[in-house]
Amino acid sequence: MYRNDVKEISMEQTKIILDENEMPKKWYNVLADLPSPIDPPLDPRTWQPISPDALEPIFPKALIMQEMSSDRYIDIPEEVLDVYRLWRPSPLFRAHQLEKVLKSPAKIYYKYEGVSPAGSHKTNTSIAQAYYNMKEGTERLTTETGAGQWGSALSLACNYFDLECKVYMVRSSFYQKPYRKSLITLWGGNVVPSPSPDTEFGRKILQEQPDTPGSLGIAISEAVEDAIAHENTKYSLGSVLNHVVLHQTVIGAECKQQLAQVEEYPDVVIGCCGGGSNLGGIGLEFIKDRLEGKHSARVVAVEPSACPSLTKGEYRYDFGDTAEMTPLLKMYTLGHKHVPPAIHAGGLRYHGDSPIISKLCSEGLMEAVSYDQQEVFDAAVQFARTEGIVPAPESSHAIRCAIDEALAAKQTGEEKTILFNLSGHGHFDMSSYDKYFSGELM
């Protein structure tokens, strides 16, 4: 079906690669450029803005400073860059074959973060967080994970910096994605299903709801409880917080350089959104241009209709976890007691969102859409059969939106440029694809 256009396609660049020495050396902090400050996190004991000292039991000082920093750029430590060089800069692809099948005048580009050792964008922050913890004498990290991308990324990072790693993996994904468990174990991590018998809160949930699928909110509570209870242990979070979003901005910085090589700038930038880190990673560099009046690219968050915090949640203060142990964050939320259905995009089953992403959406600087699981997998299969890469279910939400943007351009004849973040591969999600092909998706 491609024969007639082979010559034309071969003359256009498909893969845009940066040299290692072109890798960004700084993270971009959008807090420096927002028209007004984001609302501060609140201490759950007083409901007053939380002090840095109150966060020290669970986070290292360097990450607390980054969380509250208003500096526009923060230097990436050389030790972190050394590990980044294993896979960064990551490639930017032009989706020629998908464009051909869609017969759209739109140009579609995707940034592929699945080339990292753990197979997703999560390694961009896990390496940084493990490094800063190691520097301050932390010996052990605890964390939650949804589909397992974050848990495996942190396990890898802890292995590099000689830290122990305890992962509380949301129960539904623990059984849906067994090879993510294997990967966590391979890199030296200890992974258990959440809720678990290893914490007081986990035991409470299991007693009250023995058949619960679990949630990221529950897993966060367990990981925080564990960190507080053990010496030389800190908690590590894979999304939501400012410093996590900060570390992901290498994605967008590379995209801008790569698109400049082919004299392109996106009209729309798309990322799936659970906690918001991969969306912020690809989108905030373009938000910066918009705030400076240079360009006006739309930035679109794509979430599952089964967990639609941005599209149907309330913008208010809420806890980041189910047990009410974390600071209160101003964000779009479905409520911290919310337990979403056990969809296959386990990494997007979070009740809230990044305060940065939430503020940008509330002020109209970002927009949000949601899709159901069936139409997301339809897009994933179409992408795999054209571009050859098997996408993670989470990343496939961005693909669905990109395809719809291209089809809309087909209707209007608009020659728009679409950029989306393919945040991870789906090699450990094949059982989910099996469910799709057998008609057994929820």
From Swiss-Prot:
Q: Which reaction does it catalyse?
A: (1S,2R)-1-C-(indol-3-yl)glycerol 3-phosphate + L-serine = D-glyceraldehyde 3-phosphate + L-tryptophan + H2O
Enzyme Commission (EC) number = 4.2.1.20
Molecular function per GO? L-serine hydro-lyase (adding indole, L-tryptophan-forming) activity; pyridoxal phosphate binding; tryptophan synthase activity
Instruction: Specify the pathway.
Output: Amino-acid biosynthesis; L-tryptophan biosynthesis; L-tryptophan from chorismate: step 5/5
Q: Which Pfam families match?
A: PALP
Q: Does the keyword Amino-acid biosynthesis apply?
A: yes
Entry superkingdom: Archaea
UniProt modified residues of type N6-(pyridoxal phosphate)lysine = 122
- Residue stretches in coiled coil: none
Q: Which GO terms describe its biological process?
A: L-tryptophan biosynthetic process
Q: Which family does it belong to?
A: Belongs to the TrpB family.
Q: What does this protein do?
A: The beta subunit is responsible for the synthesis of L-tryptophan from indole and L-serine.
Q: How does it assemble?
A: Tetramer of two alpha and two beta chains.
Protein name stated in the entry: Tryptophan synthase beta chain 2
**Source species:** Methanosarcina acetivorans (strain ATCC 35395 / DSM 2834 / JCM 12185 / C2A)
